[in-house]
Amino acid sequence: MSTYGKVYLVSGNKGKLAEVQSYLAHANIVVEAVKFDLPETQNSSAEKISWDKAVEAYRVVNKMPVGEPLRHGGTPVLVDDTSLEFDALCGLPGPYIKWFLDRLGVEGLLKMVKGFAAPGEKDSGAAAPAHRGANAVCIISLCHGVEEATGQPLVEQFRGVCRGALPPVPRGGVGFGWDSIFAPEAQTPAYAKTFAEMSVEEKNTLSHRAKALKMLTEYLKTHALELRGTKLVA
């Protein structure tokens, strides 16, 4: 059986780190956080934004000078990007949710969809009015080296989606970010709790990040031989 090593998660968010560590611990992967600012590509594609960040993170973590070709054999890095897509706004804020949250706060985000209710539509947290529908999306990008023949970065991406709805008001006191304004559909009863009202164990069974982490873990297990020679698989 392969021995899994260490990977760096580029994040200063302790809540996010705890979620990633909790999940990957089952695969014997040690996750350590490194914190530094990464430039964000201005692009409507969350996958493109995450891909660019993962490549730059690999360069920074492995101290490879800007302008020089990336080298193989460095320490692998993970970049985790989330999007929150409001049905009423045709997918916005999407990958720009961090900036919307910083400027507006969770209550301001809820106000963005308030005027989209259909005439006579009941605004209830128990149901899911059409104007409150939303998708939580997580893109995890793993940069684990460079294709030596072409010089192209080796980046694998894993996309997890959780369908849910926005409650009329923020609910719950745990979690982080916008957890208090997203209630997943895949619970009984549907939309009963926001992420901020769930235990870590509950959240890790159905969240967008959990789905992406599951795909990442399966990839690491099935591609262990290919990853030998990197610092991720010894």
From Swiss-Prot:
Catalyzed reactions per annotation: ITP + H2O = IMP + diphosphate + H(+); dITP + H2O = dIMP + diphosphate + H(+); XTP + H2O = XMP + diphosphate + H(+)
Pfam families for the chain: Ham1p_like
UniProt entry tagged with the keyword Hydrolase: yes
Subcellular location: Cytoplasm
An example Gene Ontology molecular-function term: ITP diphosphatase activity
Gene Ontology terms: biological process: deoxyribonucleoside triphosphate catabolic process; nucleoside triphosphate catabolic process; nucleotide metabolic process
Cofactor binding, per record: Binds 1 divalent metal cation per subunit; can use either Mg(2+) or Mn(2+).
GO CC list: cytoplasm
Cofactor: Mg(2+); Mn(2+)
Enzyme Commission number, as recorded: 3.6.1.66
Record: residues binding ITP: 11-16, 53, 81-82, 98, 176-179, 203, 208-209
Record keywords, A-Z: Cytoplasm, Hydrolase, Magnesium, Manganese, Metal-binding, Nucleotide metabolism, Nucleotide-binding
SUPFAM superfamilies, sorted: ITPase-like (SSF52972)
Gene3D superfamilies according to UniProt: 3.90.950.10
Main location: cytoplasm
Subunit structure of this chain's protein: Homodimer.
Family: Belongs to the HAM1 NTPase family.
Function of the protein: Pyrophosphatase that hydrolyzes non-canonical purine nucleotides such as inosine triphosphate (ITP), deoxyinosine triphosphate (dITP) or xanthosine 5'-triphosphate (XTP) to their respective monophosphate derivatives. The enzyme does not distinguish between the deoxy- and ribose forms. Probably excludes non-canonical purines from RNA and DNA precursor pools, thus preventing their incorporation into RNA and DNA and avoiding chromosomal lesions.
Protein name: Inosine triphosphate pyrophosphatase
Organism: Leishmania major
